[in-house]
Curated annotation (Swiss-Prot):
Transmembrane segments: none annotated. Gene3D superfamilies: Lumazine/riboflavin synthase. Catalyzes the formation of 6,7-dimethyl-8-ribityllumazine by condensation of 5-amino-6-(D-ribitylamino)uracil with 3,4-dihydroxy-2-butanone 4-phosphate. This is the penultimate step in the biosynthesis of riboflavin. The active site is at H89. (2S)-2-hydroxy-3-oxobutyl phosphate binds at G86, T87, R128. GO terms for molecular function: 6,7-dimethyl-8-ribityllumazine synthase activity. This is 6,7-dimethyl-8-ribityllumazine synthase. It comes from Streptomyces avermitilis (strain ATCC 31267 / DSM 46492 / JCM 5070 / NBRC 14893 / NCIMB 12804 / NRRL 8165 / MA-4680). Pathway: Cofactor biosynthesis; riboflavin biosynthesis; riboflavin from 2-hydroxy-3-oxobutyl phosphate and 5-amino-6-(D-ribitylamino)uracil: step 1/2.
Length: 161
């Protein structure tokens, strides 16, 4: 499983961060698990009023992330699922989403947690969705990474915190 070697992140003083979660709608069962994991992580971090927005698919995540980054959010979490099919569509969507979300983060300075599953099968996606029987919870992990990065950025600009 890919979770080997994952860091234990300690995040403090983040309850006042403005966080948005953007979730694609394809593969409903997987997405429900990712969203639940993300919202649970936010609650554990003391962020009880995040913005949750839905988009049709993963390819639409970057444009919404870009708009939100310009609206004062401290961190954005992008959740989606792309499952390989029999055409190159999978490769194009995965590359576009990954590059788009990276560009948003680098261009705006707003961390974007990458919770987009790129899997060969639905079973692989379910195993990472944070639902009962899953081995990983990528929604939770994406929130933790985004909020930890936002806290790091805040410590650089506000070292007295």
């Amino acid at each position: 499983m890919s979770g080997k070697g994952a860091p234990e992140l300690s995040v403090r003083n983040c309850g006042d961060l403005r966080v948005a979660v953007i979730a694609a709608q394809w593969h409903e069962k997987v997405m429900d698990g990712l969203v639940d994991g993300a919202l649970r992580a936010l609650h554990e971090l003391g962020i009880d009023e995040p913005t949750l927005l839905r988009v049709p698919g993963s390819f639409e995540l970057p444009v919404v992330a870009k708009v939100l980054a310009g609206r004062g959010y401290d961190a954005i979490v992008a959740l989606g699922v792309v499952i390989r099919g029999g055409t190159p569509h999978f490769d194009f969507v995965c590359q576009g989403v990954t590059q788009g979300l990276t560009q948003v983060s680098v261009d705006t300075g707003v961390p974007v947690g990458f919770g987009v599953l790129t899997c060969d099968t639905e079973e692989q996606a379910l195993d990472r969705a944070g639902i009962e029987g899953s081995h990983e919870d990528k929604g939770h992990e994406a929130v933790t990474a985004a909020v930890a990065t936002a806290a790091t950025l805040r410590s650089v600009s506000e070292p007295w915190r």
